Structure formats: C-alpha cells, structure tokens
Amino acid sequence: MAKIIKYDEEARQGMLEGLDELANTVKVTLGPKGRNVVLDKSYGAPTITNDGVSIAKEIDLEDPYQRIGAELVKEVAKKTDDVAGDGTTTATVLAQALVHEGLKNVTSGSNPIALRRGIEKASQTIVKNLLENAKPVETKDQIAATATISAGDPEVGEKIAEALDKVGQDGVVTVEDNNKFGLDLDFTEGMRFDKGYISPYFVTNADDQTAVLEDPYILLTSGKVSSQQDIVHIADLVIKSGKPLLIVAEDVDGEALPTLVLNKIRGTFNTVAVKAPGFGDRRKAMLQDMAILTGAQVVSDELGLKLDSIDDTVLGHAAKVIVSKDETTIVSGAGSKEDIAARVAQIRSEIEASDSDYDREKLQERLAKLAGGVAVIKVGAATEVEAKERKHRIEDAVRNAKAAIEEGLLPGGGVALVQAAGEAEKSVKLDGDEATGADIVFRAIEAPLKQIAENAGLSGEVVIDKVRTLPAGSGLNAATGEYEDLMKAGVTDPVKVTRSALQNAASIAGLFLTTEAVVANKPEPPAPAAAQPDMGY
C-alpha cells in the first residue's frame, strides 16, 4: 500500500487533532456529574456508557494522521485499564493536557528530548509522593465507598465489598447476566471446575441430582482409566477404609466405567468419576493445582506411576466433594498450607510475566480456586442496553476495589494529583529545558480536577485556586459541591489507578513530543459509481 509522509509541526498537528477528537469525547464522562456517551453499533441496540476505554475503542477517525494520534491515546486508556481497571478517562485527560503544554514549548524552540526527560522526572517524583501518602484499606466500608464511586451506585458498592470480604484479595469476582431484575450475589465454596459426573448412576441425592462424597479419597490421573484391573487395584486400596472415592481422569471408559457403576449400585464402595477440566498443558496445570490442594499426587506416565501399582500415598483427601451433572466442587482439601502458598506464589509470578489477556484471566481463575474463592454478581435490568451498561460498570468497580486493597487509597476527585504535584514542585531541581518539562507536568496535573469541576457545572480555575488553599486531603466533593475532607467523606481513588493514569499519560506525551515524522497509509480513492443499466429505451 502507498504511504504518505508528514514532518515536524505538520505531522504533530495532524496527530494532535486526532488526540483532541478522542479526548474531548471521553472527558465529558469524568467525575460524579460526568455525562454518558452513546455508541452506535452496526447491529443490535446502541451502548450507553461512561467508561473511557469503551468509548475510546469505538472511535476510528477517517484522516490517517488523526487516526494515529487517536490510537496513541487509546493506548494510554488501554494500558491504564489493563493495570488498574479504572482511571482511563483521567489518563486520557492528563495525556491531552501534557501534549498541549508540551507542544507549545516545542513550537517555541525547546528541545523535545530534554522536555521528555523533565516530564519523566517530575512524574516519577509525583508517583513517589502518591505512594507515600497512600492510606491502606482497613475496613469493608472503605472498599464499599471506593466501589460506589467507580460504579456510581451504592448498592453495587455494598455487593462488591461483601464479595471481596468473603473471597479475599486473590479471589475472583465475576459479573453475569441475571434473568431477574436487580443484583444477586452467589459464592462458591472450595475449588470448583466445569466437569460433572460421567454417569448418572453415580448420583447419591435424587432430589437435586448430585453426588455428595463425605471425607473422600481423591485419585488424580492425567491419563484414561480403561481397564478392569486398574479399578480392582484402586478398589482394594479404598474399600478397607470404608471411605468414598473421587476419580478425576482424562476419561473413564472401556471395562472401567461399568465396573465402577456396578460396585456403586451394589454398595461395595461409593465412587464418582469425572473428566479432568481443560486441555493440554492447562489440564496438567489444573490437575497439579488439585493435587496440591488435596495432598494428592497426579498419577502419570511421565512420573513413572501406573494405576495398577500405586499405593494409597498418591491419594488426596477433602472434607467433602459435591458433583452435579455439569460441575464438581472440592471443599476443604487436605493439602499442606506451605505447598498451597508456594503454588499461589508461582501462579502470581506467571500472571505478572504473561502478556496475554486470556492467559492472565485463566491464571487468575486458578489462583482464586487455590487461594480465595469465587463470587458471582448477577445483574438484571429493565432493558438489555441498561443491563449491559450496568454490568460493565460493575466489572470496572470490582477491579477498582481490588486495586485499592493492593496499594491503598488517596483523596479522590483529582485532588491527590494536585497536592502531590505541589510537594514535588518544591523538591524537583532541574535546569534548562528539563525544568520546562517538569513545569509542563505541574501545569497539566490540574486537568482532571478542572474537568471534574466543569462537568459539575463549576469553574475549573476557581476550584483549583480554592483547593490549593485547603489542608492536605481536603478538596471538592463534586457530587455535593462541598469542600471537605475527602477521605472522611468516602471520596477516594486507589493509588494504583491514579499513578497508572499519570505514568501512562506521561509516557505517551513524551512519544508525542519527540515525533518528527509520521508515515501513514494513503487513503484509497473512492470506487467509481457503477454504471446505470440500459433500460431498453
């Protein structure tokens, strides 16, 4: 495809126009009085949202240079959302302010590289101040307040606080559709996976069609259980104890399945067979998770273990196992706490190292099953559009609350940034264009607070002047229009969200300022209109 190239001011101006198109659309959503944006779809109902990253994803500009500028800001929003789950609009507003302030100085002859260094140094100092000023999350009410601000709904805040209180920081909180109006919260106790009994003959409770095993042995194998000899050997190990047995295998077929069913019907010993979850390497990893949770050892050819020659040391234990047609839950596995903690640490490391959203999600699910639990918030609303929008807000609020637990809280409403920048301004000592770069940050840092005030119908400049005179932690509560101690009022932001927004905005601003040429795809000429058919006259 042919390319078109622009240089210097002309290149940056085209990108700036695209940045402004996107940022001006997104920033109207900032703060408690922020507005919604309607996103048209090529099919189905339109989406109504105030989520910055969702809006940014939908914007695709026609001009190639504007499109590149918009894509750079989309990256700011996406990175902030990936790391913290919120703060996308704040990051976009900061990026716009930093780029505008920076380009003024580049146009007047400042060195872009020195400006970039100054921006980076000032941002690092502000982030350091934010982390030092953070207040740890100590109560369920603090989690509820943080989630309430993110979702804009006190009921959602309470549900999320209850869910995280139950499953812990490493637990998973998922959001699903509900066929009833309102919010419901369900918890999963123990490790649950999406595989049920292989045969309905294993059912022990006819009323709800489940098989419940109390204090069972657990056999885990990465291969198939097919021969009758395998079952006879396993039965000899278990029958003497009088305990039931759960078998988790790639499959149970051949002579093995009817042998197990027959023994169950005759009452010789109580057993349930289920297929192992997942495929390939993920299946191996999940079997190993189960082994560590229950104190078992996975029987596999790789380890030189055969079903017809194992002893009872490879069997795991649990307080209870509940198996339905579609899923299996292992409650209170007997694995060692030290082994479980080590496995949790390993999975955490894998999450940090992974650059795939899908892999991270699956690893997080495994982590939750080992370390915490799973809570499901079910969302119902009057219309599909409303349900979709509410579901999205709840997902963001969950990640926001987890970010607060992880790194602590700061006063919200853009106040923490302004006050941390005030402290940084006193300590950052730079010269020349680096000092100019730092000043760019100290001026641009006001943009989120200014935008929140303007979205609430107030004068941004007046609010900023007022906030600068207030004690640390006090500022504008845009929801009420009052100036107060924001921590006491429950107007807070997670440190992780605030610092990620600043770091990502500063990074993109630096790239913007140091751009000297833009190579874009040449737009395709419009196709000629089709010739009209001869009507035969």
Curated annotation (Swiss-Prot):
Pfam family, one: Cpn60_TCP1
Binding site for ATP: T29, L30, G31, P32, D86, G87, T88, T89, T90, G413, N477, A478, A479, D493
One GO term of the biological process aspect: protein refolding
Substrates-to-products reaction catalysed: ATP + H2O + a folded polypeptide = ADP + phosphate + an unfolded polypeptide
Record carries keyword Nucleotide-binding: yes
Organism superkingdom: Bacteria
PROSITE patterns linked to this entry: CHAPERONINS_CPN60
Any one GO molecular-function label of the UniProt entry: ATP binding
E.C. number: 5.6.1.7
Record key words, sorted: ATP-binding, Chaperone, Cytoplasm, Isomerase, Nucleotide-binding
GO CC annotation: cytoplasm
Listed CDD domains: GroEL
Catalytic EC class: isomerase
Subcellular location: Cytoplasm
Chain's role: Together with its co-chaperonin GroES, plays an essential role in assisting protein folding. The GroEL-GroES system forms a nano-cage that allows encapsulation of the non-native substrate proteins and provides a physical environment optimized to promote and accelerate protein folding.
Quaternary organization: Forms a cylinder of 14 subunits composed of two heptameric rings stacked back-to-back. Interacts with the co-chaperonin GroES.
Family classification: Belongs to the chaperonin (HSP60) family.
Protein name in UniProt: Chaperonin GroEL
UniProt gene name: groEL
